[in-house]
Amino acid sequence: MTVIKPSHFVVVPTAMWGHLRPLLHLSLNLLTLHPNLHLTLLVTPSVLPRVEHELKSTSFAHIYTKSPSGSGTSTPNPNVHHTTAQEQAQEDKAIADRLQVITCISPEFDMPKEWSPEVIAQEGMDYAKTLPKFLQALASKEHKLDGTENKFEDIAPNFVVYDSFLHFVPEVVRGVLTGLQKPMIPLIAFIPSNAAATWHTFAKEENGGTFTLAQRLIDEDIANGMDVLEAHGKHAFGTYGKVKTIPGLPPKFDYEWWPNFATVPMPPQAFMGIIPSAKAIRDPAVSGIVCPTTAETEPLAVEALEKEMGFRIYMAGPQFPDAAWAGEHPEPQAQNADDANVFAFLDKMKKKHGAKSVIYVSLGSLFFPVTRPELIRYILQSLKESGFPFIFAYASQMASLPEDLQKELNDDEDSCVVKFAPQWDVVNHEATGYFLSHCGSNSTAEAMLAELPMVSMPFAADQGEFTAMLSEVYKVSIDLKQVKTFKSPDFNKLYDGTVVVGTEEAIKAELKQTWDTLRGPEGEAMRARMRDLKAVIKKSWADGRSKKDMLALGTCFE
């Protein structure tokens, strides 16, 4: 006889939507898969509206239905014993009843009318300062969390899932539980990336890790009298012209892994905030890492990461609701004027040019070639000149579009330019056939599920690793080479022998060749290969490593 006891996990996310969204989806999928789990999500005010909007989306309608269908269904089982009336009623609850979203911020924080990067940075510091108070209240099973009712006051947290960039979390949790004279609970670090990039970031220096190398060089420069900010700015994603081989990927010069980082201004303070995560992730309290990617697509990298870290790596797979995996796409609902423009444009393009005729261009919610905005002009003008209908979304706070280019595109009926686009709806529309992307983890996963051939324009972080996998291992993407902009002008040759000329003429010639390839036989071959890749990740989600690790993650505290 199995005894089912309610359990409770706390999620501590960063305010970056590209990190928070897959972590939110992971959390909801865990609730769906494990009927005994309860979730407390501690968020900042700046991202609360987006979280609430995501929870209300049609993709997650099932979480509000009692006894939901799908993998979260909990049917009566005579071999299961419920120890309390509360547990007996558990099976009749909706998934949303086992979720609480709590805003974690101090009363002293001055809520702004608009969220600037500076205010968000202040919010992050306040969150770190306030987090211990909220964790203590949860661990003590208090009825109120700074005025908000604690729905799960009878269930103390069993484990914590936290964004790996919030390096202070292990020490905070340890301090709270030690003060309460309670035993330490498992901590799981969430990294919204693949195994290859995680290994590249967090491996020891002697094995090829970048953060540990940067930390040593920073410490040496500071010891020799260099200013702290200057040292961090100097070595942030530093490259030295050396060949770097990442498990499962082809060799490249180190600067090729962050191929457009030089176009994105990064304050030294930003790197100062994340580099300690390389040390924190090896804290004894951290018992595992969860990556929302598929182990079967990069077995060598997964093996290397497991060997490097020495603890459990949960390769949980891309995080989508069951309806998305089943290929169900509800009729999209416009939430604003941009959405309405996008949907009308796609419907029009399908009638005019046919199915799979539109290319969607988006570089994510964070990245944009700020120091080389002409790259965007070249791309969009090249598409226009080639008669290739497109949607361009520029969601980054760093992004802006010159007025003359905006006017030029507004006058073109085959162009649609918006600040924000409902990406999941766009990539799954019948008119959409291709995706030009920075190849972040979320965009890559959505392109795979939508079976879209890709064009890659990576900047930094894990985008180079995703691009190498997509373009060179699986050949489902074309990597743009002439747009690459490295930190040092001396670095202009790729490991494969390509010389980056980088002129308007060279860039536009490569772009034209790319558009011709996409719309020719090779483009359809790429689509077929992407379909095969999708089959691999779907099988893993259904009954492979992803399913196995999702099941294990929900019981990691046992």
Per-region residue spans from a language model:
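Glycosyltransferase specificity loop/lid
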Residues: M1-I281, G288-C291, L300-V302, E306, ...
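Hydrophobic pocket-lining residues within nucleotide cofactor-binding pockets
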Residues: T294
